[in-house]
Regions:
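Hydrophobic alpha-helical transmembrane segments of multi-pass inner-membrane transport and secretion
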Residues: 1-11, 259-295, 322-323, 327, ...
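Membrane-proximal juxtamembrane linkers immediately C-terminal to transmembrane helices
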Residues: 13-36, 60, 102, 145, ...
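Hydrophobic, regular-secondary-structure patches
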Residues: 15, 24, 29-84, 94, ...
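Membrane-helix entry/capping segments
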Residues: 22, 211-271, 291-294, 334-364, ...
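Mid-to-C-terminal secondary-structure elements
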Residues: 92-104, 118-259, 459-648
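Alpha-helical transmembrane segments of integral membrane proteins
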Residues: 252-256, 286-323, 327, 331-454
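Transmembrane alpha-helical interface segments in multi-pass membrane proteins
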Residues: 299-337, 663, 684-723
Length: 723
């Protein structure tokens, strides 16, 4: 029980320590935007490109700002090999002013101020150069250009809500200075001045937003900000303290999958329940065997020992047992930690067990356990009267001990509730794997970075279709399991009335996309190269169709402004409606989506129809090497990519199930011990009953019926609680 509690304590401690490595963690906040546009609602962890700089300029409480944004994977040349690196981000040069990222080599004031430069972590520097003294050296990226290394930082701690290995200067992103305040794509962080009240800063955020958004809203949709808000729309900004992001933020466009404070509460509760069950076991077994020490107590009292002396003696004995249990628990936790890290996805070092704060926590835990588990047995044993001992009135049975029976009931109430919780979690995990997502992800291979092929991408796709075992192949900018997204707003008339605006995911795909991914067309038709008009055709999902609420959706027109600085409006017509499919978390409702017909070659998804998948992959790779011999062949399976979206949920569920099973096992061991002792106390009775012809079933029923009654009582209490 103690070892299990230690592991949970390490997990909870790790979760609560996120981002606290930053020296100014209490002064750093992330800026969020919340948008209501017609019937569309977005809760975003991102902002317009210029919001951070405007806050520094117009709000004296804001000392500095820094932006981060995912760059996407790159290929780095090492010898003759191109190695894929996935954790690459754009960052402002002020990154090192806001966050505590110690630089080993280079100057943090200039490190991210050069085009075609990189700041890398210590691990990356050693991986490619076997040294951290690499400032000034270059890395060949994507076989297209050399990037100069301008800084090497220490590895970012695991307890960070972002964890990049490469930082690219923000100036390399063409949208870094975009003055469109209606486009949110940037994770923006601000460093507040000392003794600044976050609430006061938040109160000034919306007036700042309105000053910049109002004129642009008027320009784009010819509506004032007041009219926009009267129609029910709004754009609001807020701040999230840095240390609250990991456990308290679940917004759209988070930099990485966050945790959940509810899980911390749940695991803490499980730790307490396991500790309680273990203490109850100890108390029950100690008092059950009390008759073994009754004569000792009687003799000591006859010789003049006071009750307080006996209580002190028994408490001392029990505390020594607690000390021994703590030592065994520490050794057990040490040995189990690698397996626990693998289960939880953590990287907790065994030395953590011996950090000062941890040692204090463990000593406090030992004291509480010793006091909780030892008090009742100590007072119970010291209450024996010499006369009762001599007369043999003390019994080790269970019917007379209402407190012991109550503790058994408590144990099994906890165990039954945990059993129900385990079943629910297991079914949730099964639901994730078996849910009909509205698209086929089985045996679909996604080839990444096909945009590097340029015009050769179509040729490559067509050659893949000639391979035996390939049923279909499609080019697109997004797949349903991508983290990246592209949102745009469309209107039902050229008046661009905000009240009729609909925010939709906008994905460019080819004519094979819908059949290759097994999507179902409910109305209309698929894209076709036979219709020139399909260049402005779109296919929407059910969620978009429901918003439009039109009986005749086919050929209905939708409009969107071409860009912020133009009065031009792009017109599209609906040619089909597809069944909703999940392209975000299963916790979220499916939002409106539109597919556009075009040449987007970000990736190619291949539907495989063969039992010999390795052979098909080998032939696909051969085709790739023929077309792009110098480019790395990078692929993944769509079902694996889908599972990665739910890694946090799956790990959390597995941890819960593991600890719940341990709690149930500990409770069962305690009950087994009590039943075994009860059998020992009734050996003579069992012998007599056997002589008189009692069967094994009769004897088993006799020994277990009292406990079965307790389990039944526990069930009546636990079922409503679990429900």
């Amino acid at each position: 029980g103690l070892a299990t509690c230690m592991l949970i304590l390490l997990y909870v401690r790790d979760e609560l320590s996120y981002d606290r490595y930053n020296t100014n963690a209490d002064r750093i906040c992330r800026v969020n935007n919340e948008i209501r546009f017609g019937d569309n609602y977005f809760d975003l962890a991102v902002t317009p490109a210029l919001q951070g700089s405007a806050m520094v300029r117009e709000m004296p409480q804001v000392q500095q700002y820094a932006r981060l944004r995912w760059h996407g994977s790159i290929f780095v040349r090492k010898g003759n090999e191109n190695i894929r690196e996935g954790r690459v981000g754009y960052a402002d040069s002020s990154l090192f002013d806001v966050f505590t990222l110690p630089m080993i080599e280079g100057d943090p004031r200039t490190a991210l101020k050069e085009y075609h430069s990189l700041v890398v972590t210590e691990t990356i520097a050693k991986k490619y150069f076997n040294s951290t003294d690499v400032v000034g050296k270059t890395m060949l990226v994507n076989d297209t250009g050399n990037y100069k290394i301008t800084g090497v930082i220490k590895d970012i701690p695991k307890q960070s809500h972002f964890n990049f290995d490469f930082f690219v200067p923000m100036m390399e992103n063409e949208g870094a200075n975009d003055d469109n305040w209606l486009s949110e794509n940037w994770n923006t962080y601000v460093l507040l001045r000392k003794n600044t009240d976050v609430k006061q800063v938040e109160a000034q955020l919306n007036p700042l937003m309105n000053r910049h958004i109002g004129p642009q809203l008027q320009s784009i949709v010819n509506k004032s900000l007041d009219d926009f808000e009267k129609s029910g729309g709004y754009i609001r900004a807020s701040l999230t303290p840095l240390t609250a992001i990991h456990l308290h933020s679940n917004k759209t466009a988070e930099l990485d999958a966050n945790g959940n404070i509810q899980f911390v509460y749940i695991f803490s509760a499980i730790a307490l329940l396991i500790l309680l069950i273990a203490c109850v076991n100890f108390m029950n077994l100690s008092t059950a065997r009390s008759s073994n020490r009754s004569k000792e107590v009687g003799v000591r009292k006859v010789l003049g020992s006071l009750r307080k002396n006996l209580v002190q003696q028994f408490l001392t004995e029990l505390f020594l047992v607690s000390v021994f249990a703590l030592v065994v628990a520490i050794v057990s936790a040490w040995l189990l930690l690698p397996s626990f890290n693998q289960l939880s996805g953590k990287d907790i070092h065994p030395a953590t067990l011996f950090q000062p704060k941890m040692i204090i926590s463990l000593l406090a835990l030992m004291f509480i356990v010793g006091l909780l588990a030892g008090s009742y047995p100590a007072f119970f044993l010291s209450s024996f009267q010499p006369v009762d001992v001599l007369k043999g009135k003390l019994a080790g049975g269970f019917k007379r001990s209402w407190l012991r029976n109550s503790l058994v009931v408590v144990q099994f109430v906890i165990s039954i509730v945990l059993i129900f919780g385990t079943i629910v979690i297991y079914r949730q995990l099964s639901y994730i794997h078996s849910k009909d997502l509205g698209f086929n992800r089985s045996q679909v291979l996604t080839i990444n970075h096909t945009d590097m092929l340029g015009d050769r991408a179509i040729t490559f796709r067509n050659e893949l279709l000639q391979i035996s075992g390939v049923r279909n192949a499609t080019m697109s900018c997004f797949t349903p399991v991508n983290f990246a997204r592209n949102n745009n707003t469309y209107f039902t008339s050229t008046a661009l009335n905000p009240a009729t605006g609909i925010g939709m995911q906008s994905w460019t795909v080819d004519e094979n996309y819908i059949p290759a991914l097994g999507m179902k067309i409910l109305q209309g038709r698929n894209f076709s190269t036979q219709f020139a008009s399909d260049s402005t055709g779109i296919i929407i999902n059910e969620a978009a169709a429901k918003f439009l609420a039109s009986k005749d959706l086919l050929n209905k027109k939708l409009y969107t402004p071409r860009d912020l600085h133009s009065k031009d409006i792009d017109e599209y017509h609906i040619i089909g409606v597809i069944k909703n499919f999940n392209f975000s978390s299963l916790r979220d409702v499916v939002t409106p989506l539109a597919l556009f017909f075009g040449k987007s070659n970000g990736n190619i998804s291949v539907q495989i129809n063969s039992a010999n998948i390795p052979d098909v992959i080998a032939r696909i790779k051969d085709k790739w090497k023929t077309i792009a011999p110098s480019q790395a062949f990078d692929y993944s399976f769509m079902d694996d990519d889908f599972n990665k979206l739910y890694t946090t949920e799956q790990r959390t569920g597995q941890i819960f199930i593991t600890f719940a099973v341990l709690a149930i096992l500990i409770a069962s061991l305690g009950l087994f011990g009590l039943i075994t002792y009860a059998a020992e106390q009734r050996v003579k009775e069992v012998g007599i009953r056997k002589v008189l012809g009692a069967s094994l079933r009769n004897i088993a029923g006799m020994l277990s019926k009292d406990f079965l009654k307790l389990v039944l009582i526990a069930s009546f209490i636990a079922f409503p609680v679990a429900w």
